[in-house]
Amino acid sequence: MHKTDRFVSKKWGVMCHLLHNLQNNPERPSNEGIGRTPWNEFISQIDVKNIAQELHEMGAGYFLLTIMQGDPYMIAPNATYDRIVGSTPGEYCSERDLVLDLDNELRKYDIDLFLYFTGDGPHKNVQTGNAIGFQDRYNEAPISERFLKNWTSVLKEYAERYKDVVKGWWIDGLYPYFGYDDEKIKYYHDTLKSVNPDWIVAYNDGHTVELAWQKEELAYDPTNDNPQPLPYPLFKRSIYEDFLAGEAIDFNVYPEGRFLDGSQWHVLSPLGSKDGLSGGWGGANVKYTQKYLLEYFKTIWSFDGVITVDMGLKRSGKFYEEQKCFMIELMKELNN
């Protein structure tokens, strides 16, 4: 028995970016024309019942959700964070615990919950970034021990609260040019595993997707029914990785077996094209044909690989209809 067996049994899941600069940004379609509101109000309005119901309709086995990304805003309370950055409850950390509320709904459908956290903290905000200890991300300033201790103490509070709630974590932004190596990644590993050693965790540095952006010859038409494998396969980021982070621009990476260097093979890629965040993350449309993803899913599952589909989530807690219907039909075909 392997610790990722349950993950493999789920086969596929959905990731969503729930962010201040996405759903709470009036310039984004996911804002639904509501405009920008205080963070606390924004989080209080999200319909977790609908999120869970639509995930169930699509047949997703698990859901991966961002706690934060770059901005200082968190989707749940965190007294440690408030103390370090000098904020009040509800200012940056919502008073509503969206994670607990969401999990209560997901459990009704046996949908597992995973959480996304980062390795670069709230760097987009000068005050919070400096308070945590890492703000100069774009000048490739190396992370410090002060930052690692502060930031993992924030993670520790969430970990202890969600010990029996979530099934695992996906940690982003562990770039080598920040100074990340296994010694520094161990801060996150020890923080999480000391709370729940059964959690499965992935550590990401965006290596595969960065290569794809840099190499023009990797550009291809994802509507083509005959996909070509990416010349740069997924890789294991850290010795502490239970499953591959698996970030890729497109679903055109393939395994050679269930495990890679002892870690469960897994891919994460956006369903939409570049109308959301960079690379299509959180986008609203579908860039693939049904036939393309049908064959892709079959191939990955034949190796006991796991697939996470990044989809756009609207402010109300609804998925884009085009994407939702596409995944419903895809699962019908796969389950026939």
Each model region followed by its residue ranges:
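Mature catalytic domains of secreted/periplasmic carbohydrate-active enzymes
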Residues: 1-336
